[in-house]
């Protein structure tokens, strides 16, 4: 994407295919656009307030006028999978759509095989450009 609006558009398009039980990790350095991407997803589901990373609360819940919510995790402050399991657990994984910032860095060993991974990389020559790789383990 070339700018914030492109990123939100891509996320909005991606969100059309999400369903209950989907787990998505967003990975990239600080400032790479993870939260901007999540705001694009939120827009698709008519979440009116800006989505911000739950760095200290670990998880935010958003009702989306369906029979399930969206859970937004930021596991940056979680030490490892064991701490995540002790403090949060995996019950959320089946209850709604889970969007997990830093998931591949911190809790990759407890994520289901069907997890969708989104890697975001900054362009070194253009401060506004981002590259997105969306993939799933085989």
Please place each PLM-identified region on the residue numbering.
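N-terminal pre-Walker A segment at the start of P-loop NTPase domains
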Residues: 1-13
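Post-Walker A helix-loop "phosphate-sensing" segment adjacent to the P-loop in P-loop NTPases
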Residues: 43-52, 64-67
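Conserved nucleotide-sensing/catalytic segment adjacent to the nucleotide-binding pocket
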Residues: 55, 61-102
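The conserved Walker
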Residues: 30
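Hydrophobic anchor at the beta1->P-loop junction of P-loop NTPases
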Residues: 24-26
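Conserved lysine of the Walker
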Residues: 34
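Short phosphate-coordinating micro-motif centered on Lys-Gly-acidic
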Residues: 43, 82-83, 90-138
């Amino acid at each position: 994407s070339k700018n914030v609006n492109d990123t939100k558009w891509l996320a909005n398009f991606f969100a059309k295919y999400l369903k209950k039980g989907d787990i998505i990790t967003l990975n990239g350095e600080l400032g790479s656009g993870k939260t901007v991407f999540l705001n694009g997803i939120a827009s698709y589901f008519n979440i009116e307030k800006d989505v911000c990373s739950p760095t200290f609360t670990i998880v935010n819940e958003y009702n989306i006028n369906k029979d399930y919510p969206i859970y937004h995790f930021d596991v940056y402050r979680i030490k490892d999978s064991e701490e995540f399991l002790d403090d949060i657990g995996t019950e959320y994984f089946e209850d709604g759509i889970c969007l997990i910032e830093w998931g591949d860095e911190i809790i990759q060993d407890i994520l289901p095989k069907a997890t969708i991974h989104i890697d975001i990389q900054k362009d070194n020559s253009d401060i506004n450009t981002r590259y997105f790789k969306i993939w799933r383990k085989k």
